[in-house]
Structures are given as C-alpha cells and as structure tokens.
Amino acid sequence: MARKLQITVNHDLCVGNAMCETIAAKVFILNDDRQSEAKYPDADTEENILEAAENCPVSAIKVVDADTGETLFP
Amino acid sequence: MVTTVADDMFTGDAISDPYSYYGKLRDEDPVHWNELYELWVVTGHDDLVWMTRHHELFSSEFWKRDQRSPYPAIDESDMGLYQFMREFFMDWFIQHDRPVHTDQRKVVHKWFNPNSMELWRPMVRSVIKDCLDEADASGHMDVMRDFATPLPLFVIAQMMGMPHYDRKFIRSMAEKLLFIGRGETDRMQPLTEAIKEFIEYLTPLVEEKAAKPVDENDLLSVLASGEKTGALTRDEVVADAILLLLAGHETTINLICNGTLAFTQHPEQWKILKEGRLEEPDAITRATEECLRYDPPVKSIQRVASVDAELGGKLIREGDRIRWFISSANRDPKKHDNPDTFDISRWPNTHVAFGSGIHHCLGATLARLEGQEAFKALAERYDNIKVETNEFEYQPSITFRSLKTLPVSLT
C-alpha cells in the first residue's frame, strides 16, 4: 500500500504558477487567490506528487512521509 | 480620475526615475487609461497579482489580439515590418494562453526547475571567477560590460550549445531586439533586422538538433524535442530559441548591474551582506530578492483583455491593451513597509520581479542563481566598490531597466 504523504504549500512563496496543478491535478487545487493547496494528498501517485513538487518554480511545496516524518522533498 | 502625471512614458524623467513616475500613477490612479497610447496602465501590487492570476480574463496573446495602432507611433512606411514583427512574436510560447501555453512551456519547464538549475552553479562560479580575476588586474571594471553582460550570456549560450565565438553575435542581435521596448519611430528597422538575422542563424542549428535524438544536457535539443511531441512547430522552436537566448541573459544583466549599484549607494547594506549576519534564509538569498524588488530588471509587461473585466473599479473592455508595471508594484506601500528603502533583511519578500501566475518567469531560478553567485563573489572579494561616475544613463526602454554603463573601482 502506498505510504501516506503530508504535503504543504508555502503561501509566502507560491506564485500560482500552477505547474503542480498541471502535473497532479487531483491533488493540487488553486484557491480563490489562485494559490495552490494540496487538498487531496492521497489522490495521485507519490511519483507524480514528487514531480509536481520538483517542478514548482519557487520551491513552495514540501512533501513529508506522514507516518515517519521523513522529508521526501525538498 | 484625473492624474497629474503626463502620459508620455519616454521622457527623460520617466526613464531615469520610473519609481517616481509610476509611483505617482499608483498613488493617484492605479488603473489608469493612458490616452496617448490607448493603453491601461496598472501600477499597484494587488491589481497586478490579481490580473496575472486571472489569465482567462487577461490574455497573453498580445501580438495576435491587439488591433490598435502601435504605441508609441512608428513610421507609416514601416507598417509592413510591424506586421512581420507581430507574426514572429506570436510564435513565442509566452504569447499564448492555456492550454497551448502549458503544453509549450512544459517542453522546457523542467530544464529550469530549481533542482536542475543547481547543477549549473559550479559553472556560474567559474565564469564569475574569470570575469573578476580579469577586473582585479586593473582594479577597475565597467560592471555592465565586464561582468553583468558576459556572465549570463556565457551561461545561456553554453546551455544552448552555441559556439563561444557566437556570443558577440548573439549580444549584438539582442541589443537590436531590445528596440521592442523603445519609442523611436524608426525602431522597426533594427528590430526586424535582428529577427531576420537571428532566424537565419538559428534555423540550421535547430535543424541539426531536431534530426538527432534528444540530448537532455542541451537546452536547444530539449526545446527542439517539442516538435517531435507536437507541442511546437519548427517556426515556434526557432522563435522560442531566440526568446530563450534573449530573455536568458538580458534580465540577469540588469539584476547584477542594478543590484551592484544599489549596494554602492547603501554602504550599510553592503556591510551587512559582507558580514553575512542574517538568519535563514541567508544574507545572499535575501539580498538578491531585495535587489529584485528594489530596482527590478523588467519594468513592465503587456496583456490584452479577452473579455470585459473589472479591475480596480475600472471597466476594461474586451480587446483593450494593458501594461502592468513591476517598478511601481514592487514599491507599493500597501504591500511593503518603507518600500523606497533598500533593506536586504526584508523577509518574506513578496516582490513581483518575475511576474506571477501561470506566466511567472521561466528563468527565475537561473536569474536568482546568477544574482546570488555574483553578489556573493563581489562581497567576498572586495571591501569597497566605488562608482566612478555621477551620471547614470538608462536605456530609453519602457520594458527594461538597463543602465548603459556602470564604471567602478574595486578595492
């Protein structure tokens, strides 16, 4: 079974580039300010989520193993 | 609302001090109809961010959709050249809206992501070392000519696999392309000359890359792979290659030059940078962001309304053209405390030097990396950087904030 992820988007950094939404649309939803929120962390594969995080142009996305606390990205 | 600001954006005052000119507009009429250019001028931070994040209302297809006369006016006999220029710019990926823009940006987006860019840091350091070693021999340099220009030009040319002896040619073409932001009535001449020469230069290079399997270490090859996936046509690959070459160095030139000038004018900030006494994020990171905020490389960008839309209480009609100003948004007192103060400790620094939304600058991480390494090297190497002139002359551009020269002594 896939491990549970805790995904956070730093809104001091997020510029609404929406590449995360393009790569993992089921997970990342833009809010009313058009900033990204990781609404559904279980809705896509870990690989896609990490790719979305890696392609954030301002490194606003952090991905952590929810059970162990291990940082998976950055 | 009536404003006391004259509509001509190319006066000596507006060029030398955009912060007063656009700042006054922001304070008096933040969404201003400029009658002279038939153009909405957006100058406040919040309006700018809202607009750039509502790309479905404000289109990036400027050259395709704008039906009004060129502004400022051009020679009547150059309308054919104007049309040629428009058609060329329409091929740039940044001149598209979703979904085409996303498909095209994705071809090269990964190349520029923060992890990928880190791999280039050692090379950036080595180019900086070479530039500064040379400057040390005389104790003087023109920051523009000897440091700010060669560094990013070398890096983008290297990324795209251009032979080193072509850098001079690339720069001279870029200088002509920069007429895009100027006001001379005969500006279409140098501009279209450069487009034609650039296309001629890049077409065989793109042809060569497109014929081979994609080389992930070569940006031009990666870009050309977009043709194989159907995201780009051959003409679009060539046009985007020109865009990457131009935008890949022109903006960073200004970051390094304007930032260095700011430090020479604020010795107490230079001292903080040298001593590095700031908490995470470190002084270099904060300083680079503050340089981007305080005297940003790009002054303004265009959009065109794709529907009737309200912005700042004004009704913007479908087809209206709009220019949003980073210079004034980055000094907006509603967003930044003491906005006219150069303060490298400022954090978080929510400037909009790279725009915002889906069109946020593709090369932002590269610009940051080069800026960080440049300021770091200057701070490590020199106690004093003294400007050897009292006159600062800027290129007469509405788009770029570019010093012509910046002669300094180094001790």
Model-derived segments and spans:
Chain B
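Cytochrome P450
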Residues: M1-T411
